[in-house]
Structures are given as C-alpha cells and as structure tokens.
Amino acid sequence: MEPLTIGYIALPVALFLLAMRVPIAAALGVVASVGIFVIFAWRPGADFQPEYAWQPTFSLLINSPFAFITSYTLSTVPLFIFMGHISYEAGFTTDIYRAARLWLSKLKGGVAMASIVGCGGFSAITGSSVACAAAMGRIAIPEMLKFGYSKPLATGSVAIGGTLGSLIPPSVLFILYGIFAEQSIAKLFIAAIIPGLLSLFAYIVVIYIWVSLKPDAAPVPEETVTRADRMSALGRCWAIVLLFVVVIGGIYAGFFTPTEAAGIGAAASLVLGLVLGRLKTSNIGSALKETVYQSSMIFAIAIGGKLFVNFIALTGMAASITALIDGSGASVVVVIGLMVVMYLSLIHI
C-alpha cells in the first residue's frame, strides 16, 4: 500500500474520532502513531513486514515530541499563562471588569458587555481562551445572575468572550501556529490586534441586539454610579495596561523577542502583585498549579499535532493536495472559501 493511500485513509479516521469527542491529543496521536508504523512496515514491492517498523517508529515517536517540547520558543506558552493567572490572583482582571461594568452600567446588557471587555483585557495578558473564560466566569457570571440576567446570556457572554483569548495577543494559538508553520510570532501578534478588537466590538453589538429583542434577559441594575466612581475604577486598570504595553509594545518595537517578552511579562506581573500587596504565597501556588494544568493540556495537544504533521509529511499528502489545487485552476477566492468551510466544519466537530 502506498503511503499516500494510507494518508487518505487515516485523515477521515482522525476526523471521525474527533467527531466522537475523543480527546484531540489522543485522536491525533493514535492515528499518527499507527499510520507511521504502517508506512514503515509496508515497504514498496514487499508484503506487510512489521518487524522492520518498530525501531524507526519508536525513534520518531520519541525524538520528534522531545525536540518539539524542548523548543526555546515554546516556553512562551507557560510563561504567558502564568502571567495571566498571577494577574487574576492579584485582582488585575477584576479591576478591568469592574471599570467596564461601571462605565457601561446604564446600558441594557451593560454587565454582559463588561464581561466581554473584561475577557478582552484579560486576553491581552494571558493568551489562553480556557484561562480567560474560567477567570471571567468566576467574576462575571455570579454578578450577572445577581442582577437578574438570564442564564443563557450570562454564560454565553463569558463563553464567547473567552474565545478572544485565542485571538488577542499574546495568543497561545498564534504561538503554536507560528511554530508549526514556521512564521514570525511577533508579526502574527501584531496582525491579530485589529481582528481581535473587531471581534470584541461585534460581540458587544450581538449582546445589544439580544437585549433589545428580549429586555427581560438583562435588567438595568438599580445602582447609583458617579463619575468619580468610574474614574477611580478606570485608574485601577493601570497594571494591565502597563503589562500589555511592556509585552506587546516591546515585541512590536523590537526590544525583545516573544519568548523574552513572555518572561518579562511573567516577572513583571509577579513583582507588581507583590509590591502592591495583592499576592500571598497561596495565590502564587494556585497560579503555578493552574499554569501546570493548562500547559500540560496544551502541550499534549501540540505533541499529538506534531506527530500528525510528521505522519502527513511521510505520506506526501501535502504535495498531493497542492498539486490537486494547482491543477484545478481554482481562484484564490475559491480556495480561501473552501478553507473557511473546512474550518467551520471542524468547529462543529
């Protein structure tokens, strides 16, 4: 059996496993491992010979993930996640949410809109959608329910706001994409700023339309908020603004690389929290524990993805698909449209 045939068989199997809710790391890793073994065992012009496949398969399965995980650039992932969790433990996330809530307090759906803004602010210092949704969920959902917001609106606004963590820099997703695609992470970060802000604004517009159609879903809180309260809350957001400017501004200005920026951001958030008296030993321990949990999950998925990329390279599928697209004569717009459809299909999976 030709490697290309093995690849075209394995791809739908991987998609089927994902559709069956098999963990991503397991689905990609298992399919890639079996596929690599079969390719090495099925030599051209010979029968299936598994005795020749064990050594090269295990060599690839061990060396490739090790080389990937020990990558210097990949260290940005736990560092940015740690920066986000330290900022949450220090209350910086609460500061930006409270400021947004007070400034939007008189609008219908203002608390839900504030959760979106809070997610955007938190995304700017963590880059993890999971950390963003979890942190903002603990802060915003209880408050929205207290004010009489409907549960679908309360939970939905935090869930969709959490996706900003995958778009607004420093996005972990862009870091992994940059490593896999061998692209500049700094350029990816800069390119994501405007789409991230547009997405944030679009989510707010959707909430406004929702509460306009269903006013009972978001009662306006009966509270008195003065201009002094708003300005005071806004002034307390300086820590998050400083961290974002140092990290993203430093990358954009060329002062340091994304990896160096992650280290500086993590150290700066820790120092700020300690100097301001907002962190205790238990807070740091909690941040470290959450960082280990989330980094382990992300690394497991990344290892599965790396093995699958190696498998695809062995099959020659990339060259085959490229030749197919070139030979079809399809325009760039059609190709991009097909890619969008594919991505949307994967989201539903």
Q: How should each PLM-predicted stretch be described?
A:
Residues M1-I349:
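Alpha-helical transmembrane segments of multi-pass membrane transport proteins
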